[in-house]
Amino acid sequence: MPNVKLPDGNVKHFEAPLTIYDVAHHISPGLAKAAIAGRVDGVLVDTSYLIKEDCSLIIVTEKHEDSLEIIRHSTAHLLAQAVKALFPSAQVTIGPVIEDGFYYDFAFERSFTPDDLSLIEAKMHELAKANLSITRRELPRNEAIQYFKSLGEEYKAKIIADIPENEALSLYRQGDFEDLCRGPHVPSTGFLKAFKLTKVAGAYWRGDSNNEMLQRIYGTAWADKKSLEEYLFRLEEAEKRDHRKLGKALDLFHFQDIAPGMVFWHPKGWTIYQELEHYMRNRLVDFGYQEIRTPQLVDRSLWEKSGHWANFRDEMFVTETENRHYAVKPMSCPCHVQIYNHGLKSYRDLPLRLSEFGNCHRCEPSGALHGLMRVRNMVQDDAHIFCTEDQIQSEVAMMLELVQSVYKDFGFTEIKYRLALRPEKRVGSDDVWDKAETALKLAMQGRNIEWVDAPGEGAFYGPKIECSLSDCLGRIWQCGTIQVDFSMPARLEASYVAEDGSKQTPVMLHRAILGSFERFMGILIEHYAGKLPLWLSPVQAVVLTISEKQNEYAEKVRKTLQKRGIRANFDLRNEKIGFKIREHTLQKIPYLLVVGDKEVENCQVAVRTRDGIDLGVMTIDTICDTLTQEIIRKGSI
């Protein structure tokens, strides 16, 4: 006779086994109607799950954090059912949940078209409205293989053949459609009220380019229509803000097939890049870093010693000359240890903070490349701090101060922190891990930082803090990393003479703030929709003449601005002023300085912003002072 403990601490006693739906109905008919699934002793199950023994139970409704994954997984099955109804010869393969949605891969003799997607989505709504019951059954492995083969579903049979023989196989049926799945699923298709198919793309079977190409249909699903509409709005906004489109429209950069995943920076884009580098260089000097430069092409022997050759070889560009094998560096860490090792180090030399704008190359798969967000050639704001175990906390605290300050200057104030803790397989003693993890926690506490623990997700060589930004659309971008490393210094024979004269191995702290310049620029462009803050804008002001009579004065204004350190340009073309204003507004130039006869006479400029705000007339000195102060304030405006 099961006793069921509910989240509020109450225990319900039942005289016989019963389903989760029955428990929900016992509490209230409304809860039973809203129940999507249940969590029994921490495990998600269907509402049809039979409770036979004492347990704790959370009844999952659409308001519960678990509901979205279940809704999306069930909607993927609804998609597959609709495709099979409309295109019976299509074979189903896999349909997992992904961030903000789901996809399903199909084997079909032709590509699905946008018109097909509209038909499929309409069929999905029809099936959802039918409120078909979703039921679960189990089959022995071999019987399941034969069952799907009899349906002509060869891919599904192959998937089952790869599942261990002792693993229970469950199938879910809705109407005349049945699919292999672990579950859980919603009780009926009527729970699926808010979904949208978003796109179709090609995908190789099992992700292997040697296999056949499948058709992947993507979709999104939410608990209610309001959430779906909000997501679709964000998706539309993200499309408008796509850094690849803005990069072309604003003449910042481009990509070419002659150098896949490598950026061709145009003058305006390179200006932004240089501003980032200049800013970071100055901040690092303030925090006691010494900038270094290491080779890009390094002998294979170093990568073997560091462990990168064994674990990272497929992502490295390699070459051979004079019977020696070299690799273009995918990261700077081993080279930084070489600089540390050059000369005897004492405990008095620690902490030693080395930084580099490391030019790195990684052989990312061509299908994974995505504008500035995923490239093969990137520059990282790499830094490595060599310190003692006792210095970890103070060094990490200093890094966190720098991280928070830098992100604030770029206009990001909502930062999420994640602490990746020791994995099962690791180097170093438990005492050392205890000390390192405690140091990271105390450093964050000292900065009043809230974080989420991620047990088991640390690297084998040390715990780490991950710093993620939230942009204007609520998207999360992991950029900063503070990684403790107990392994590499020992592998590469780094040492120092301790106070007692003994030879000791330093701890190495890997630190990145922006991550890569390329990706961070992509994030900035999308966050600001191309309207970068004044201090980052490639052209900060443009002087616009009404007629050629003001050309000489416009040149004088531009030169004055430039002498004050403001990136200024002028437009002397014989075009109407309205045309000029519109054109430079579309180019997202922060300030438009219009000069006509009256402005020339009074040594003034008429000031407009790119948002169309008229700031009136100002003297040249006043506009210079105004822009200079805004540049100094950076993200604190």
From Swiss-Prot:
* UniProt cross-references to Pfam families, sorted A to Z: HGTP_anticodon (PF03129), TGS (PF02824), tRNA-synt_2b (PF00587), tRNA_SAD (PF07973)
Which PANTHER family is this protein grouped with? Answer: THREONINE--TRNA LIGASE, CHLOROPLASTIC_MITOCHONDRIAL 2, THREONINE-TRNA LIGASE
UniProt name for this protein: Threonine--tRNA ligase
- What is its subcellular localisation? Cytoplasm
Catalytic activity, EC: 6.1.1.3
Instruction: Tell me, in a sentence or two, what this protein's role is.
Output: Catalyzes the attachment of threonine to tRNA(Thr) in a two-step reaction: L-threonine is first activated by ATP to form Thr-AMP and then transferred to the acceptor end of tRNA(Thr). Also edits incorrectly charged L-seryl-tRNA(Thr).
Show the SMART domains listed in the entry. tRNA_SAD
Q: Show where the TGS domain sits.
A: 1-61
Q: Which UniProt keywords apply?
A: Aminoacyl-tRNA synthetase, ATP-binding, Cytoplasm, Ligase, Metal-binding, Nucleotide-binding, Protein biosynthesis, RNA-binding, tRNA-binding, Zinc
Q: Does the keyword Ligase apply?
A: yes
PROSITE patterns noted in UniProt: AA_TRNA_LIGASE_II, TGS
Q: Which GO terms describe its biological process?
A: threonyl-tRNA aminoacylation
Q: Which SUPFAM superfamilies match?
A: Class II aaRS ABD-related, Class II aaRS and biotin synthetases, TGS-like, ThrRS/AlaRS common domain
Q: Does the keyword Ribonucleoprotein apply?
A: no
Q: What is its main location?
A: cytoplasm
Family according to the record: Belongs to the class-II aminoacyl-tRNA synthetase family.
Any one GO cellular component localisation term in the record: cytoplasm
What does the record note on quaternary structure? Homodimer.
Q: What is the lineage of its organism?
A: Bacteria, Pseudomonadati, Pseudomonadota, Gammaproteobacteria, Legionellales
Q: Name one GO molecular function term.
A: threonine-tRNA ligase activity
Question: What residue stretch is flagged as signal peptide?
Answer: none
Cofactor(s) needed: Zn(2+)
| Known catalytic reactions | tRNA(Thr) + L-threonine + ATP = L-threonyl-tRNA(Thr) + AMP + diphosphate + H(+)
- The coding gene here is thrS
Q: List the disulfide bonds.
A: none
- Tell me the superkingdom of the source: Bacteria
Residues reported to bind Zn(2+): C333, H384, H510
